[in-house]
Amino acid sequence: VRRSASATTARCLSNPGRFLAGCDGAGSRTRRQLDIGLDETDLRKLVVRELGLPRTVATLARAFRETRERPADGRFYLVHFTTPDAEILNRFGGVWHVQSPAGWTVISQNDGDTFTLHAPLGMGTDADRIDPREFVHARLGRRFEMDVLVANAWTPRLTVADSFGRGRVWLAGDAVHQVTPTGGYGMNTGVGDAVGLGWALAGVLQGWGTPGLLRAYEQERRSVALRNRRTAARHSLVRAAVMATNRAELHSERWLGARTRRRIGREISDLGNLENEALGIELGYRYDTSPAVCHESGGQAPRQTMDEYTPSTWPGARPPSVLLADGRALFDLFRRGFTLLRFADHDVTAFVGAAAERGVPLDVVDVRDTRARALYERDLVVVRPDQHVAWRGDTPPGDPLHVIDRIRGAHHGTRRSDQEKS
């Protein structure tokens, strides 16, 4: 688009391609063109169901009575700003998140001068008439110098698309899932989508991968999106429970205020800090039903919980991060294609030959490190380009072509293990 004093000129470009990746956000036109629906969890109904209608109504009524704040309608208002008076926001020491029982949160974006405030909006509030500076000052309780970078209303959503694409058009990121910011899963899930879709498209375009990789992408990433939506909803409920504890006497300097703060502090502590400590969600997700992974028929898969991460090379998992004895990170040894990690002396000539026969990029990386071998659990581990485990074993596979075909998307719908094949 070119603008001048007298005219605006637009030039449309057409770029043909074999595939289209729709990464066009929550209002994705690509998704709508494909007529793909969204499965949505209504956050307000969820809060009422989990906290109970009487408690929810009592909380809203008390907030209005004590502060004359209108009951929240589900929207939030964000103000992204910089300030030279950062010490005002760090008066109790440097923190990343400051969360108020009133429902607002201040986030330190750079451990310096940049912050974001998110605060609920009351029913009937016209967001276009809000003065961002006054909005911030009213919630933080004092005035200070600030430069507003961005300010707008937004509505938290908990949605997952019914499909992640089809044929030559596939979707990723907010186009297929939107979650509340609680836990920070939105962008992180989208990055995982980009990696998952990227290597699948590369495989198909380079000729060694089949369209089955794209179907596997949907199965793998949609399961993660559903899991992260459930977890983000759980964290939002904790926030709602904290808001339900809010009382005007929290701010009293008298003995009742101190007593109330101690009691509510215990209640908040009992709710836990899983929103910031859910390592099982952040690191421990697996593609347990993927058609592009060689699953195991025996053994016990590591237990999956929100708060615990168990390092493992169980097929479909992300392999553990290990620093080798010489100081190198094992992840830095992974290749752009598939990586066959060899922790012991095994002849993998047939395995490498099978990959070459199918045109699959497979590099052998020898690792002689006792600690790494213990964490990786097998003598041989194949890691996919997206750094998920595709196959593992203590001996080379009896039918290497079967393994190679499966991890390139040429087998669909079964969970046939290599142990069964051999």
Identify the meaning behind each predicted range.
Residues L43, V48, L53, A138, ...:
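Helical substrate-recognition/capping region of FAD-dependent monooxygenase/halogenase enzymes
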Residues V1-R259, V365, D418:
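Core Rossmann-like FAD-binding/catalytic domain of the broad FAD-dependent monooxygenase superfamily
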